[in-house]
């Protein structure tokens, strides 16, 4: 995020005059008890992997499905995958092209998910998959972390900046890397809990209060500077 914006704006402004103010996210997303009465509307499982996919190439859906196929070959648990915002025909095209129809029985694809149900779905997920090719910010990462769910995010564009150094980042062009990170979470309980705790702490940095306070601080600094003198 910051790097891309800075590269554009420094063509016209000195870098010292640029300050990044991060978005917040809805406080509706927070650590909460499991809600099977909600999650069962979308997937018939107590535990699952969660992916917000669509037909936009940047969401990296084909590689996520390849990674999931690799996961099924190596996992003892074989957790099902909940895919939001993607219709069955779109999934079928990918599975047929990649010769992966054998994994379809492990997939749940309810299509559109109500925003009011998202927090429960994040909370019920074993992990949230977000290995996009690029994102300008990545609010779903923060929503999932705030719900106590470990994330697996791409190591490109704004995602490392927002997710932070302690997050589980992957090469989004490598299904094998995505597979390995899912298995790392599944096979290492201590590491899994560390990711839960890291995400809860990291997500607290992105409240709308912090956004407002950052903006207020900038406005105060500008009002005391000579950057925009007031004419009398």
What is each stretch, according to the model?
Residues 1-232:
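Carbohydrate transferase catalytic cores enriched for Leloir-type hexosyltransferases
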């Amino acid at each position: 995020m910051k790097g891309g914006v800075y590269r554009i704006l420094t063509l016209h402004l000195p870098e010292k005059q640029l300050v990044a103010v991060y978005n917040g996210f809805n406080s509706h997303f927070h650590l909460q008890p499991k809600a099977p009465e909600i999650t069962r509307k979308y997937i018939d499982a107590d535990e699952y992997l969660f992916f917000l996919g669509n037909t936009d190439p940047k969401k990296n859906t084909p590689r996520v499905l390849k990674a999931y196929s690799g996961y099924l070959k190596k996992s003892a648990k074989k957790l099902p995958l909940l895919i939001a915002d993607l219709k069955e025909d779109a999934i079928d095209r990918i599975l047929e092209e990649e010769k992966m129809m054998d994994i379809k029985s492990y997939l749940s694809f309810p299509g559109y998910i109500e925003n009011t149900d998202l927090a429960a779905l994040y909370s019920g997920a074993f992990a949230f998959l977000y290995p996009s090719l690029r994102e300008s910010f990545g609010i779903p990462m923060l929503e999932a972390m705030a719900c106590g769910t470990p994330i697996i995010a791409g190591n490109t564009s704004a995602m490392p900046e927002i997710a932070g150094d302690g997050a589980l980042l992957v090469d989004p062009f490598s299904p094998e890397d995505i597979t390995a990170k899912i298995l790392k979470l599944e096979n290492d309980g201590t590491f899994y809990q560390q990711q839960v705790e890291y995400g809860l702490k990291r997500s607290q940095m992105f409240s709308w209060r912090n956004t407002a306070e950052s903006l207020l601080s900038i406005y105060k600094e500008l009002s005391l500077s000579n950057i925009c003198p007031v004419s009398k």
